[in-house]
């Protein structure tokens, strides 16, 4: 990292501000050759760190733009190197001309992600924080953004630090037992050691579980609206979207294929799917639509089964026919503003895991209760404090740690000596190092010497 890199760090296209960032040993020297103020170019000694300097970016005799310039002296910068920022007016042609001049002065084009790579290599960030920055930039919902923010501010880093500390303490105990077996020292019992390992394993499993739940929410819950024609599926779709997305008609079979649309529910992207009405038909195209409706319904995360309570009479027959589909669904009794006297929600009391809600798409009655039920089904929807987000690479390493600890427990139960099962603890520690890019085996010695009197 002896060279100096530069790149435009704002998004492409025109904007109010365009920023060029430069990092490396020659960043300040190169910068000073373009900073013109009070009829002269500024010398490096005149540029104070962490101070906004208003000046002209000038190439030779040619004034390019009135800019703000910032200098961050190593190691107190994002990359840990000397880092400079030029804040231009955001014209891409202007930025290109300035950047080309910076390259001619000795900097080279930065590679993709190279500023963050240098931050990692200079220990300004660990790998989990680098990955969190990428997630922060690409987040598609408030929920994902909040989870990325937690990782940027060290959520996974703190977890791995705690995990590592516990495993090093465990390893120190085991190594002391091996190396100082002739000393008159008291060690923890096997049961105590098993409990410690189980606790560490449980921490990892909880983390993985929270991440899996978070990933499910980020990847979109699919909520499928299902039922016979004219039960109000398309009307409910429009109500939930807050706009006319599905065609509404009294003619059965209007919706021939499923229609899907994304909404944000408590900051989480949810995919709503309006399906074709299910009925007996000879129309080939409508049959294909109904087949797709069935597939969508079966694969849904949340199933909204709509019925028209203003028309249906024989509810017991309906329950017997639809029981399998009703189980685990939310039954939406629509059109309660024109309720038929035959309707009785208690008829559904023996259907397993069924929520019955009464609504009117026309008057909006019961819609808030439906939204609450959806949130309940998704499990504390939108509360990012209940979740942790792991990248696929991180999850793999934590799952490997769990396997190492499982094997450690197995060896302990089989009566294996510490010399054998300590290797699995070593493997687990190596995996933690892979998570955040830090491995330091010397720390184990420090733990041993601080705990036991060995200096004879």
Swiss-Prot record:
InterPro entries reported in the protein's UniProt record: G_TrmE, GTP-bd, GTP-bd_TrmE_N, GTPase_MnmE, MnmE_dom2, MnmE_helical, P-loop_NTPase, Small_GTP-bd
Function: Exhibits a very high intrinsic GTPase hydrolysis rate. Involved in the addition of a carboxymethylaminomethyl (cmnm) group at the wobble position (U34) of certain tRNAs, forming tRNA-cmnm(5)s(2)U34.
Top EC group: hydrolase
Gene Ontology biological-process entries: tRNA methylation; tRNA wobble uridine modification
Annotated EC: 3.6.-.-
Signal peptide positions on this chain: none
Entry's Gene Ontology cellular component terms: cytoplasm; cytosol
UniProt binding sites for GTP: 230-235, 249-255, 274-277
Keywords, alphabetical: Cytoplasm, GTP-binding, Hydrolase, Magnesium, Metal-binding, Nucleotide-binding, Potassium, tRNA processing
Primary location: cytoplasm
GO MF annotation: an example: metal ion binding
Family: Belongs to the TRAFAC class TrmE-Era-EngA-EngB-Septin-like GTPase superfamily. TrmE GTPase family.
Organism: Leptospira interrogans serogroup Icterohaemorrhagiae serovar Lai (strain 56601)
Co-factor binding details: Binds 1 potassium ion per subunit.
Protein name: tRNA modification GTPase MnmE
Cofactor: K(+)
Subcellular location: Cytoplasm
Residue positions binding Mg(2+): 234, 255
Oligomeric form and interacting partners: Homodimer. Heterotetramer of two MnmE and two MnmG subunits.
Record-listed (6S)-5-formyl-5,6,7,8-tetrahydrofolate binding positions: 21, 85, 124, 456
Any one Pfam family match given in the protein's UniProt record, by short name: MnmE_helical
Binding residues annotated for K(+), in chain numbering: 230, 249, 251, 254
Sequence ranges assigned to domain TrmE-type G in this UniProt record: 220-379
